[in-house]
Amino acid sequence: MKLPGQGDFESSDAHENAHSEEPDSGLGPGPGLNGPSGIDIGESQVSKDPLLFIQLNELLGWPQALEWRETGRWLLFEEKLDMGAGRWSAPHVPTLELPSLQKLRSLLAEGIVLLDCQAQSLLELVEQVVSGESLSPELRGQLQALLLQRPQHHIQTMGIRPCRESNAFRKASRDEDAPLKHQNPLRQKLPAGAEAAAVLAGELGFLEQPLGAFVRLRNPIVLEPLTEMILPSRFFCLLLGPPTLGRSYHEMGRAAAVLLSDPQFQWSVRRASHLPDLLAALDAFLQEVTALPPGRWDRTARIPPPKYLPSQHKRFPSKLQEVTSLSRQSAALAEDKHHHGPHTPIPELQRTGRLFGGLIQDVRRKACWYTSDFLDALHPQCFSAVFYIYLATVTNAITFGGLLGDATEGAQGVLESFLGTAVAGAAFCLMAGQPLTILSSTGPVLVFERLLFSFSRDYSLDYLPFRLWVGIWVTAFCLALVATEASLLVRYFTRFTEEGFCALISLIFIYDAMGKMLNLIRAYPIQRPGSSAYGCFCQYPGTGGNTSEWTSAKLKDTEDILSVPGLVNASFLPPPECIRQGGHPLGPSCHTVPDIAFFSLLLFFTSFLCAIALKHIKNSRFFPSVVRKVLGDFSSVLAILLGCGLDTFLGLATPKLLVPTEFKPTLSGRGWLVSPFGANPWWLSVAAALPALLLSILIFMDQQITAVILNRAEYRLQKGAGFHLDLFCVAVLMLFTSALGLPWYVSATVISLAHIDSLRRESKACIPGEAPNFLGIREQRLTGLVVFVLTGVSIFLAPVLKFIPMPVLYGIFLYMGVAALSSIQFVKRVQLLLMPRKHQPDMLLLRHVPLSRVHLFTAIQLACLGLLWVVKSTPAAIVFPLMLLGLVAIRKALEWVFSPQELLWLDELMPEEEETIPENRSEPEHLFSGNDSEDSELMYQPKAPEINISVN
């Protein structure tokens, strides 16, 4: 059981509210745009007020030539017009002067307030406002003419040409005939149904008394000249007065615009019936204003927008809070079973009490989505995902195929790895409950294969027939687990277990990537100057020119070398020239290219760093948002292409991707079907049940831990999980691969989560200051299916794939492993061990759990991780599956060390522990109560995840 916002461990890691049901166009409302702005799922069900675009027009040029100029605009945040630069400022949190709010309140209390005005045009609106003022007919006419004067808007183009004043300020009439998208790029980023509000402020010499008016239109109308965007206007505010107060009218205009941009004030004023309601809303705003001491803050500084918006829940009236609290609680419980600890299991984990009942329910749930699983893949983003995952899958197949060939002495190899990956993966994508899962060989299963082969060799057993019976028993055991709905045990896989497993395999992944590079350097050694071990000489036939004389000579420097009869330093005579002249190149480095090792390291780290940089550029300030999105989505693909291009340009003989070119088993003399017994005795088919039991535990733990991670509700998957169906498919494929002598396959967490990461949907357009909204994952079956089909035909793509350097693929593997390890919450707690207390970030966890207890919990996890690594690396690796089960047992034992409240924050609660926590528990109570605790805002925000790329 997790707490809201605990998923990323830091209090700031709760993401903005995003609606998964929004269309992928990105034009749907973002955080705070439905209902009172800033309200999320539960609150938006109570009210759906449209987004309000507020524009401040200021009267400038007194006393010479009066004109209205746009000087500010608001959506979520304020944008000021920098007059000198002729451009809009970056969106920032507005700061107000308290006297301006007080003067605004006084002006509105004594001025004109028209609620539900029936005006149908700007002229009618101005007439109603002016008629309410006690002015002479002449002044009334002047005021009316002034208010009808067309303002000058600043429409910033997307070009790089410097703006002159004549271009920066354009008359609205000049753009009336231009297409809307060319008039204002901001218009494209507003959701459908957005409305406008105009605030007019300034000094007017012929006025003797301040003039204030606030108008709410019953039916919004387009007051075209007043705002830069052609939107129906709902509110109109006028603040004018004699030129005696300096910039006070400008600040009052800003105050009015900020009020209208405030969610709670806007919600209240939309429902106000009389002037007291309007003033009460303003007073409520004043009660929540935070003042900054003048001597501790630069008033000209602009506060950047927060990364994540706080919830507006507790700012609304008590009755609305009660309704939204219930609605929010219901939505929150549905949002993430891990975050909010539901008291009833999710549908996929409800016990039916019938044989294969869970499997039947999974099939029924997934059948209705089957057609859309293919139609939803018709999107350009899926092409990037296919290319990225295909290269990762092919590299993984080659890597594990080579390792498996070494471990089994050629009984299985790269060809079996390709064939098994293609057939098993494609079948799984077609029939699985979670088609986003990518099947692959995994490290723990490879360890078991190595041990099984060693056992067969030591006892002179026929390996493949023995392995066949192990696979048959594993299939039987897994089918029994499916029949008895054993997948319900995943409720006991808390974050403690998941992090231990993911951290272990992440380290294995990083270790293997680095190990492969070290092996490559050994194969292509670095030639250090002056090293006799890497010499290369040209030997000529004749007297004294023989090998014994060369090897026995005491060569201490270049002169000694050149004085040996018949020998010439190869630095002066390359091996090809030596051969042409009748000599013979002699020495260990005659056929070694000295640049291979260093250049391979360059490709390795270039692809690794490029993938990280391009992934992070998606959330940077560089380039337009469309370019950033493309670079982020294609980060790994671009890193691979960059490495290939660099390798091709320099033309060095780096090791390339090797793909089998012949379709036949690696072990000569055997057919594709494995004989049931071979040379083994019959009773071995029964004895195989014992290792099969251990392998079944490993398969179950590996598959279901991956499934739990993949199906976390914060990923906003809409089509549900299929724990029972996935395990059933893996069990059937175990029988198939065992019969053909192919590798065993299970869910590969690293590639599966990389698959999800490549398919994440975000809003395409965001209003200024708003981060892109996480909309969910593009759930479909086609990308995985195409990946595995391409893997199967890769034998015929060898002429193309042979140009991909292996160091580049090792760099991508390192990237996935590092990204996985850095995203695990456990690693962030390990970092606390190295931080002085005063430098530790402000985390919710540290507010509720003593630091010593946090360190103790982290130390226990480190000890478990070290134990798993030792067991994996020793002959005792046969008990590795039991050690994974041991993680669950250790987590259960932690109940004797930590209190339920501490475990609630440090980890998740097991089903039995949830019953020990009362409904009115003190810590999580503020999640739904709407109280005023300092944590409630931070804990209240739902999580839109940065996909955690774990490992396989």
Swiss-Prot record:
Q: Indicate whether Ion transport appears among the record's keywords.
A: yes
Q: In which tissues is it expressed?
A: Expressed in submandibular gland (SMG) duct and cortical collecting duct (CCD) of kidney. Lower expressed in duodenal villi.
How its function is modulated: the record gives: Cl(-)/HCO3(-) exchanger activity is substantially increased in response to 5 uM isoproterenol. Cl(-)/HCO3(-) exchanger activity is increased by both forskolin and coexpression with the catalytic subunit alpha of PKA.
Return the Basic and acidic residues bias intervals.
12-22
The record's region (Disordered) falls at 1-41, 915-938
- Principal location: membrane
* Gene3D superfamilies reported for this sequence: Helical hairpin bin, Mannitol-specific EII, Chain A
Gene Ontology BP terms: saliva secretion; sodium ion transmembrane transport
Q: Kindly list the residue ranges recorded as spanning the membrane.
A: 385-405, 413-433, 470-490, 501-521, 593-613, 634-654, 681-701, 727-747, 784-804, 807-827, 870-890
Tell me the keywords, alphabetical order. Answer: Cell membrane, Glycoprotein, Ion transport, Membrane, Sodium, Sodium transport, Transmembrane, Transmembrane helix, Transport
- Gene null: resulting phenotype: Homozygous mice lacking the Slc4a9 gene have no obvious phenotypical abnormalities.
Q: Which reaction(s) does the protein catalyse, per the Swiss-Prot or TrEMBL entry? A: 2 hydrogencarbonate(out) + chloride(in) + Na(+)(out) = 2 hydrogencarbonate(in) + chloride(out) + Na(+)(in); K(+)(in) + 2 hydrogencarbonate(in) + chloride(out) = K(+)(out) + 2 hydrogencarbonate(out) + chloride(in); Li(+)(in) + 2 hydrogencarbonate(in) + chloride(out) = Li(+)(out) + 2 hydrogencarbonate(out) + chloride(in); Rb(+)(in) + 2 hydrogencarbonate(in) + chloride(out) = Rb(+)(out) + 2 hydrogencarbonate(out) + chloride(in)
Q: How does it sit in the membrane?
A: Multi-pass membrane protein
Classification via Pfam families: Band_3_cyto (PF07565), HCO3_cotransp (PF00955)
User: Which superkingdom, per the lineage?
Assistant: Eukaryota
Please name the NCBIfam families in this protein's record: ae
Instruction: Indicate what this protein is called per its UniProt record.
Output: Anion exchange protein 4
